[in-house]
């Protein structure tokens, strides 16, 4: 039986150094002439459509108008990202390249993404951090659902369609750096692996009782054993 490993991107695989916030500001200002309360908004663990909707409804823009413009917002974010991601010095988090190399050698592992980023932006961020996005065979993205808790089922379904095998919570692991990643793993009845390589300390993540908790992904052999167990 194959095991599906779904990785978050920002704070888990890469450090984006604020680049995502800049691309969002560019797109919102271009389309709506405002970025809403972006400067004070906590984006951690949220999907792009959730963030966009929160920011724009806060300044009185109707949800229907926002929803109609989401595809255009994603396109503008990706367009701006292609220009600035390399300049922002984005990099892989500690241990990530080594871990992905080892996982790619495992015959019964299917690598995937579960991220709040749109499907257009996600591969651009990975490339800018030196990670090949093509090694991730399936993905569930912010552009698929506003609620992050809906993404595990989407990822599992796409993995099943790709391979012809059944994927559910019993053979799926979700790896992320925020409480939202742990909660969405629980929503999908998947194994929750938390890593304190983002904005949240290990003690904070521990309060949400993930199945496994690491400071970072640097202990390749130990983490490999955990993910494959």
Where are these regions (language model features)?
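Active-site neighborhood of HAD-like aspartate-dependent phosphohydrolases
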Residues: 1-44, 50-53, 57-58, 202
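Conserved Lys-Pro-Asp/Glu-containing loop-to-beta segment of HAD-superfamily phosphomonoesterases
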Residues: 153-182
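Short acidic-hydrophobic, aromatic-tinged amphipathic segments that line or gate anion-handling sites
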Residues: 140, 212-217
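Metal-dependent phosphoesterase signature
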Residues: 57-101, 106
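A short, structured active-site edge motif that brings together acidic residues
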Residues: 40, 44, 67-71, 133-147, ...
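Acidic, Mg2+-coordinating phosphoryl-transfer loop and its flanking beta/alpha structural elements
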Residues: 174-212
